[in-house]
Amino acid sequence: MTEVTVVIPYRDRGIDPLRPANLRCVIEHWDGCDVPVWLSDDGRVGDAQFNRSQAYNRGAWFVDADVVVFAEADMLVPYSQIRQAVAMAAAAPGLVVPFIQYRYLTPEDSGLVRAHDIEPGDCIPESTMDNGESIGAINVVSRETLDAIGQWDEVFEGAWYDDVAMKIAFEVCAGPTRWVDGPAWHLWHKPGLGGSHLTAEDKAASARNKERLELYRQATTPERIRELTAGGH
């Protein structure tokens, strides 16, 4: 039997009260899926840039699972799609994304979902990303696939671009990305790219991530990918 664990990366920077509210909703959601859930922080404190890769690596180190579902703290997805993604990840190496349509819920509907007054599937999304355009919000990988890339690249911090880089890493080292047909829903919070709430360092971190992504776009071998995920340049 395939052992599965959900790893949720999270640390509250104290900036947006909707983020911990979303986390509570997401944990309640996963409680119904009958798989262990591991909440993993990045080892940093205060309002330091959140390092999702560090949180993922810490979680992967602590859990003993054949397949790990790396799922963000603001995402909801049907259990049936998770079960299908786990089976796909266990059957062959490579990244599996357990949805093909990313639905951004409105602030109002997100509040209703958190309050259990409406199901996410009954909401009209603020916008959507179709045909697998969205990468990174939920990643399902086998231990073999994770070992193939070495680890999540901890040079990335803050918001944006790390997800695209890691998709490249998985594809170079483990084969094509696969998707499960179906939706996932994003609970609204202050955005990580754009807005008056972002600090100069928030913007600088995203700019550094964008520059680092180019190294992944130039990488063509598993050896080079593992150099990068280990922190190389």
Q: What kind of region is each of these model predictions?
A:
Residues E3-I8, W30, P36-L39:
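Hydrophobic targeting segments
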Residues Y10-D31:
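Short, well-formed alpha-helical segments that are part of the catalytic scaffolds
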Residues I15, V155-H233:
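C-terminal catalytic/acceptor-binding lobe
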Residues R52-N57, M75, S134-I138, A159-K167:
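Conserved glycosyltransferase catalytic-site signature
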Residues V63-D66, Q151:
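Active-site acidic short loop of glycosyltransferases
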Residues A65-L76:
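Short beta-strand-to-loop acidic/aromatic patch adjacent to the donor-nucleotide binding site
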Residues P78-E154:
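Conserved catalytic core of nucleotide-sugar-dependent glycosyltransferases
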